[in-house]
Amino acid sequence: MQTRNTFSWIKEEITRSISVSLMIYIITGASISNAYPIFAQQGYENPREATGRIVCANCHLANKPVDIEVPQAVLPDTVFEAVVRIPYDMQLKQVLANGKKGALNVGAVLILPEGFELAPPDRISPEMKEKIGNLSFQNYRPTKKNILVIGPVPGKKYSEITFPILSPDPASNKDAHFLKYPIYVGGNRGRGQIYPDGNKSNNTVYNATATGIVSKIIRKEKGGYEITITDALDGHQVVDIIPPGPELLVSEGESIKLDQPLTINPNVGGFGQGDAEIVLQDPLRVQGLLFFLASIVFAQIFLVLKKKQFEKVQVSEMNF
């Protein structure tokens, strides 16, 4: 009996340990996968500075293109597409956090006018859902529904990102007006060069922190280097740490100067920003325009008919 109870207790403990381990894996895995958009969200209340610069450029130092396409005008309470394109050479490989090479990821931030927001799932058409794919958008802040972020996501599959946007209705939203509005977008491909805390990533160039001679280069077991620079005058030494990823440009015995590059720049990605304009159109104006155009068409038809009638009268008078 005692043996059976002991076996049962061991079985319960193993089951509990597996469950706890699985929960920890799920939680930490989720936090890691969602970490990248949080970098900007945690550091900045608004992703667009007063100068117009989007804060993602503080970490992604290389300048690359980005494009946005939106309708020229939309009606109130209407779902439309905002298509963001982040072009790059699909053959490129970036340096990953572990120093190995891998495919590039992409991400984007879309800054809409106040009142515009992510369309609810039940308002998105099947055709638009197919374009969106498995993307999951999130608000930059719970209180800022007009600012959306996405990423990192695989660049080979999502270099073109379709945002489903719902326009506001001034009839129910007093802060919305029938005006022309600006839309701002920022898009990056690849990892950043600087972390929000100011530290460098391994996806950037590393420079010498002193002038002197490279007296020793030690290659670490897990990748990366320790470079010892000896001052030729007083003999004091400085050790520069290079993380796994960047390739060395210097060798032992070489004389170097302060801020001279020790490695190549491995970054193949970059960040870009752009803008577009959209008009929230008043339906009454559209109806008025259609009525005006219709009246012009009818007037033209009436003039043509009157002209033909006049010509018939002239012909009949000449025959008489």
Swiss-Prot record:
Binds 1 heme group covalently. The keyword Magnesium does not apply. Its main location: plastid. GO terms for molecular function: electron transfer activity; heme binding; iron ion binding. Residues 1-35 form the signal peptide. It is a single-pass membrane protein. Pfam families: Apocytochr_F_C (PF01333), Apocytochr_F_N (PF16639). Coiled coil: none annotated. The chain crosses the membrane at residues 286-306. GO terms for biological process: photosynthesis. It is found in: Plastid, Chloroplast thylakoid membrane. SUPFAM superfamilies: Cytochrome f subunit of the cytochrome b6f complex, transmembrane anchor, Cytochrome f, large domain, Rudiment single hybrid motif. Keywords: Chloroplast, Electron transport, Heme, Iron, Membrane, Metal-binding, Photosynthesis, Plastid, Signal, Thylakoid, Transmembrane, Transmembrane helix, Transport. GO terms for cellular component: chloroplast thylakoid membrane. Heme binds at Y36, C56, C59, H60. Its cofactor is heme. PANTHER family: CYTOCHROME F, PTHR33288. HAMAP family: Cytb6_f_cytF. Component of the cytochrome b6-f complex, which mediates electron transfer between photosystem II (PSII) and photosystem I (PSI), cyclic electron flow around PSI, and state transitions. Belongs to the cytochrome f family. The 4 large subunits of the cytochrome b6-f complex are cytochrome b6, subunit IV (17 kDa polypeptide, petD), cytochrome f and the Rieske protein, while the 4 small subunits are PetG, PetL, PetM and PetN. The complex functions as a dimer. This is Cytochrome f. It comes from Gossypium hirsutum. The lineage of its organism: Eukaryota, Viridiplantae, Streptophyta, Embryophyta, Tracheophyta.
